[in-house]
């Protein structure tokens, strides 16, 4: 939930309103929105008592799985992982695609590192930005030609979705879709998913370096 700087009382009210609006007495996956490190966590959830409340809700069964989405560097992620022993993260939402795997922009941590840290602890991941904001469905022509030569039947976007779905620690992949053909392509890619081979993963790593 994106509680921002709301008070504990207002945050609890928003949470209870969510249950009411969803017409349910429990939530399967409850997410702390957009954490970048321990400072952001403490300011919004740790020092405010909100995290203690959410843990009690999970203990009572009204939250089935509790996690967070991450946007930040490796140092920030490491600090949040240190909280796993205390809070037991059930899942973490990370940005993962074949560019960000080892070529994340700015100070953002590489997806390879993030997924490996989650795997070490047995924490499932939810994948956001599998198409890097749509960039990996609208690649330069020389990249599209390279992908089509390797797999003439697959769409350009399907390569990115297969990357996101190949890793065994992935729980689900988020996809923003605008048109029916996007939905049809996604369904075709994942029904059933054909995991990428090591050779194909190496091919995509080379492709990312060409972008």
Spans of features found by a protein language model:
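Glycine/proline-rich, positively charged
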Residues: 5-127, 131, 138-143, 151-152, ...
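Structured C-terminal cap/extension of enzyme domains
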Residues: 86-88, 113-211
């Amino acid at each position: 939930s994106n509680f921002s700087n709301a008070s504990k009382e207002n945050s609890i009210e928003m949470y209870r309103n969510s249950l009411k609006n969803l017409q349910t007495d429990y939530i399967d996956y409850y997410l702390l929105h957009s954490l970048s490190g321990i400072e952001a966590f403490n300011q919004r959830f740790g020092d405010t008592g909100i995290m203690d409340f959410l843990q009690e809700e999970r203990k009572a069964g009204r939250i089935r799985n509790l996690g967070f989405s991450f946007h930040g560097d490796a140092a920030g992620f490491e600090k949040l992982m240190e909280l796993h022993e205390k809070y037991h993260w059930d899942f973490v939402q990370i940005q993962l695609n074949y560019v960000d795997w080892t070529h994340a922009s700015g100070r953002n941590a590489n997806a390879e590192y993030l997924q490996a840290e989650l795997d070490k602890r047995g924490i499932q991941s939810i994948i956001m930005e599998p198409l890097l904001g749509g960039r990996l469905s609208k690649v330069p022509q020389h990249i599209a030609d390279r992908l089509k030569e390797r797999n003439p039947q697959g769409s350009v976007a399907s390569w990115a979705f297969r990357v996101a779905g190949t890793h065994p620690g992935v729980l689900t992949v988020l996809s923003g879709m605008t048109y029916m053909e996007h939905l049809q392509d996604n369904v075709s890619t994942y029904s059933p998913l054909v995991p990428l081979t090591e050779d194909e993963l190496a091919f995509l790593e080379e492709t990312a370096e060409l972008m």
